[in-house]
Amino acid sequence: MTNITKRSLVAAGVLAALMAGNVALAADVPAGVTLAEKQTLVRNNGSEVQSLDPHKIEGVPESNISRDLFEGLLVSDLDGHPAPGVAESWDNKDAKVWTFHLRKDAKWSDGTPVTAQDFVYSWQRSVDPNTASPYASYLQYGHIAGIDEILEGKKPITDLGVKAIDDHTLEVTLSEPVPYFYKLLVHPSTSPVPKAAIEKFGEKWTQPGNIVTNGAYTLKDWVVNERIVLERSPTYWNNAKTVINQVTYLPIASEVTDVNRYRSGEIDMTNNSMPIELFQKLKKEIPDEVHVDPYLCTYYYEINNQKPPFNDVRVRTALKLGMDRDIIVNKVKAQGNMPAYGYTPPYTDGAKLTQPEWFGWSQEKRNEEAKKLLAEAGYTADKPLTINLLYNTSDLHKKLAIAASSLWKKNIGVNVKLVNQEWKTFLDTRHQGTFDVARAGWCADYNEPTSFLNTMLSNSSMNTAHYKSPAFDSIMAETLKVTDEAQRTALYTKAEQQLDKDSAIVPVYYYVNARLVKPWVGGYTGKDPLDNTYTRNMYIVKH
């Protein structure tokens, strides 16, 4: 990415201004705009959620709702920069000891105050083996003191380096200086959770009537596979500047159905992926309602690195080379995506990546090299490699899986069997490692290369490629020992090169965020590359 240093300085300036001025993020209704009498919003969320417990979730659909229900120390502003949430301000000593100063008017939906101890309880719960959080290793990326030993079962959760100095002061001690630590705290897994409700209701604490939240909204209704309805929380500290009273999330997996219900007036915002076959038609017919924006995500095929024959780097490399990204991007997807050559998008803040040699080859040369590698591994036209390709229910993922299977067959003679699973089962299968190759997409939790790279560490709970590389782990450990930004950037490049050398995944393309938004939905900008969209920032214009 060009101009990284300048962008980082600008982001730092925005952050400093937010902290100094204690800016409250909420719906900003321009002068002269007449609001609709009925302030309700209907959004498609793409699938039924895995859970509403911030420590039990790992996907985008769950995070979309969690941002409305729970508020962490920090939130994202409209441009994707970290901004004050429950924490009004924060400071640090040598990027190792961080102190967060909490709002005194932050409350739970039951009216009780949100305190620093709530964050201590939440973070300890997130790393507790009994919680079995898929994001258990997330705080490890921030290198909080004691986290490694806790996750290894060598220390109790009470040894985690987080403590409440008083009700409104939280101190976090890291084992290593991490200058970008504050960026991690926008993620839902770092939100506070209600101890009393969890202890009273157990696994059912997230049900309507039981749940207690501290965000701008609380849960009104949840009909599995039909809808989740949230209503405005009168106890939210900035409720006076919240406009939308109710938001409904629908679990529609089909992009075509999503668009059809949008055009019939049932939905105000579609999910962030539009049907391939309808995209150009929609751009022509309703151009002002089509929003295509940068999105910090990578679409890839995840190879089970531990399962034979995929534990052979020659097989993995052949699959990587045999994927024709130009056809996927230009003929199948055709929505402005960039072909991917690595895991971390090149436009990530703090990244300065170099394209691998193979990316400059023609597809014919890639295919030729892939066939040689397969032959070396024992696979020929008479004895072809056969793989199962797993994808979760979605029109888009199905079309891409069909295209990928066709390309691998045509280009390098690999036979592919397609396997479809619903979202929750799909996630479990990947974690359990009972698959060959799976459709995957990783969207950054914060705008920094480690949000991608850390998920490939051998001990990461998000490493569903089951990739184990001491060399990669060593490079990532080195990033914590340098304070110079240029040196750290060079190490990120080296880490990406190691992933490419090992062909840990098959990168396909870098996402764009493509969705339909009704003209009467105000406050949606699409400028946040993390797509951290908060309902509290939006409003409905009279129409």
UniProtKB/Swiss-Prot annotation:
Keywords: Disulfide bond, Peptide transport, Periplasm, Protein transport, Signal, Transport. GO terms for molecular function: oligopeptide binding; peptide transmembrane transporter activity. GO terms for cellular component: ATP-binding cassette (ABC) transporter complex, substrate-binding subunit-containing; membrane; outer membrane-bounded periplasmic space. One of its GO terms (biological process) is response to heat. Its main location: periplasm. It is found in: Periplasm. InterPro entries: Peptide/Ni-bd, SBP_5, SBP_5_CS, SBP_5_dom. Residues 1-26 form the signal peptide. Disulfide bonds join C297-C443. Part of the ABC transporter complex OppABCDF involved in the uptake of oligopeptides. Plays an important nutritional role. Binds peptides containing from two to five amino acid residues. Displays a preference for tripeptides and tetrapeptides over dipeptides and pentapeptides, for peptides composed of L-amino acids and for positively charged peptides. Cannot bind the cell wall peptide L-Ala-D-Gly-gamma-meso-diaminopimelic acid. The complex is composed of two ATP-binding proteins (OppD and OppF), two transmembrane proteins (OppB and OppC) and a solute-binding protein (OppA). Belongs to the bacterial solute-binding protein 5 family. This is Periplasmic oligopeptide-binding protein OppA.
